[in-house]
């Protein structure tokens, strides 16, 4: 008997106000970590109308022009015209930055790298599945690709009436756990006032949605909701206040997997909210790529100042090819999840973070995304005593 379900995920463009804030936070981190790999950064941003407020705790020997970094980031996104209500050239930039608490420093720094203590307590999740070629859930994968296509057509001038702010939402129909069709696709994009809604709808469907979505998923039952309110001229930080760390489900698995609650952007890799989540994805992806399971969710947890995880757990949703206890043993044998070793293994002391702040931290194929490697898949497969797996990444 066929079991049919629907699942929905959303994404937002680089011009969405929350993503503007994320990119500013990670641009500041990149500028500092490129000079001082051992910097300690917790950088938050708030954007609204003509103002950006950058605050946080930073301890470093490096120097960064936070105001200019902020302006450059806003301009690169596309907010470069006063008529948009938010312009990187003219917006006010206010900063309030202190140093990391010495109580935290005492528990984190001053040790051998492999014994680097976790920068805070917390729990993180990593997930992978065989739904897509990047081992990610299909709804979030295609939601990201839609808003990325919107940005591409805006920047290359093909659809010159597009503006930076946009959102996508993809609802897929699943049969027996596998995606088979698109039930509903929502694309809301900011636009200049002169474009008619009829022309906008036609262009969005033909130029953004259809080139991205698999054609066999689109049928007469698929609903296309393009700018459902009928108008989206006012957008970006004029329409809504943006805040770092407010799109954590967009950043991860679109709701298909659990989330520990900590955001990523603006945090150096001593913060396990970020490095622990990247490592958990690395573990889960290698387990699935190695054929040990078709779906895998990893949870890891830490205590502040302690290097060893307080727990590691695995869930394969009934798709595991070996016992989960054995899978957990293999994780402990082949992955060192102490923060210092994660940083070393994944080469995280680099200025790679601004690129992660848009279109998801996972399922990316750029070489900077080292946690997407499947270099341990074959090792795990052999250790589990399984036949050769089809590893595509």
Swiss-Prot record:
List, in alphabetical order, the Gene Ontology terms for molecular function in this entry.
Answer: ATP binding; magnesium ion binding; methionine adenosyltransferase activity
Per the entry, which co-factors are needed? Mg(2+); K(+)
Q: Does this entry carry the keyword Ribonucleoprotein?
A: no
Q: What is this protein called?
A: S-adenosylmethionine synthase
**Per UniProt, where does Mg(2+) bind?**
18
Q: Tell me the residue numbers annotated for binding ATP.
A: 16, 165-167, 231-232, 240, 246-247, 267
Matching PROSITE patterns: ADOMET_SYNTHASE_1, ADOMET_SYNTHASE_2
Q: Could you list the residue ranges that cross the membrane?
A: none
* Domain of life of the source: Bacteria
Reaction it catalyzes = L-methionine + ATP + H2O = S-adenosyl-L-methionine + phosphate + diphosphate
